[in-house]
């Protein structure tokens, strides 16, 4: 099995999650320079020109591979799909939809296509379309989530397809990275553990909330309505879930979520902002450089795998 770094040309077999409103060109470049595949989150861009600017800034700051994450339900998805070709992006990851209508265009441009899935049946459907790899993301992750855990999902996706599988959700240290390889993954995508990096552009209040978090301090909003999102517990998320269980309609619930991610990221509103974070938030204890986080993640994972091999 080829490791992800051999496929992507990165130092480590690790992808930085393309978090909307967070994963800027500068942040992606920092992650790429530190050995991961940095991703720009197109989902948070207000228009195509903003994405172009971020791609160009990333290119100016790194000579390492990087990519763009595209949310296919975004109203600018068609425009973004063309921009990544025009700007010479090397890797595209996709979520929230089927990338089928764009794959031929991307492949002709030499772009590696890696969709994110939350179920093995989706992976099996996407493989014949010509994807290069698949990210199997468990419900432990922050942001939009499915129902299956990473432990259950990854091996089933590995068994369902013949392309490389990347594990995501619940990975913040070497033990979890080693587990991802044991499940059959060729690498991992991480997001929450990078939110507390020095280079991450989120507000300091957001970082402080992450560092205060304990193991049970996340909650999933929108599960009943079909748009589940994992966030830290706060006034907004608790009230959202309470109203959802009481039968509030979509319009009533939108008053809690409209603009809530931007409030958290840019204004540091930890009461009514959407503090997206995975269940590993309770494992975060300090703000460090991206390079320190990734170096330790890989080295501790390598040591864990070596220790496990001695048991056999």
What are these regions (language model features)?
Residues 1-164:
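Active-site entrance/lid segments in N-terminal catalytic domains of soluble metabolic enzymes
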Residues 22, 171-172:
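Residue-level detector of alpha-helix initiation sites
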Residues 152-166, 172-312:
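Conserved active-site-proximal phosphate/metal-binding subdomains
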């Amino acid at each position: 099995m080829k490791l992800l770094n051999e496929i992507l040309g990165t130092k480590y077999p690790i992808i930085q999650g393309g978090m909307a409103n967070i994963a800027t060109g500068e942040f992606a470049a920092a992650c790429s320079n530190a050995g991961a595949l940095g991703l720009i989150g197109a989902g948070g861009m207000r228009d195509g020109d903003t994405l172009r600017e971020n791609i160009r800034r990333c290119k100016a700051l790194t000579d390492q591979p990087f990519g763009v994450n595209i949310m296919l339900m975004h109203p600018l998805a068609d425009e973004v799909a063309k921009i990544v070709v025009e700007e010479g992006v090397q890797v595209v990851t996709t979520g929230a939809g089927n990338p089928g209508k764009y794959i031929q265009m991307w492949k002709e441009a030499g772009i590696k296509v890696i969709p994110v899935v939350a179920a093995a049946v989706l992976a099996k459907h996407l493989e014949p379309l010509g994807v290069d790899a698949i990210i199997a993301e468990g419900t432990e992750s922050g942001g939009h989530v499915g129902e299956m855990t990473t432990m259950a999902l990854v091996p089933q996706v590995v068994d369902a397809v013949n392309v490389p599988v990347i594990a995501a959700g619940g990975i913040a240290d070497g033990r979890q990275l080693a587990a991802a390889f044991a499940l059959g993954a060729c690498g991992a995508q991480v997001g929450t553990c990078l939110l507390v990096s020095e280079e991450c552009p989120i507000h300091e209040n957001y970082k402080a909330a992450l560092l205060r978090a304990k193991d049970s301090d996340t909650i999933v909003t929108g599960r009943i309505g079909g748009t589940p999102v994992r966030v830290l517990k706060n006034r907004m998320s608790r009230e959202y879930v309470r109203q959802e269980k009481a039968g509030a309609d979509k319009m009533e619930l939108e008053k809690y979520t409209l603009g809530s991610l931007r409030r958290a990221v840019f204004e540091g509103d930890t009461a009514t902002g959407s503090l997206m974070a995975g269940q590993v938030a309770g494992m975060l204890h300090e703000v460090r450089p991206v390079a320190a986080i990734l170096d330790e993640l890989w080295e501790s994972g390598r040591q864990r795998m070596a220790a496990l091999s001695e048991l056999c």
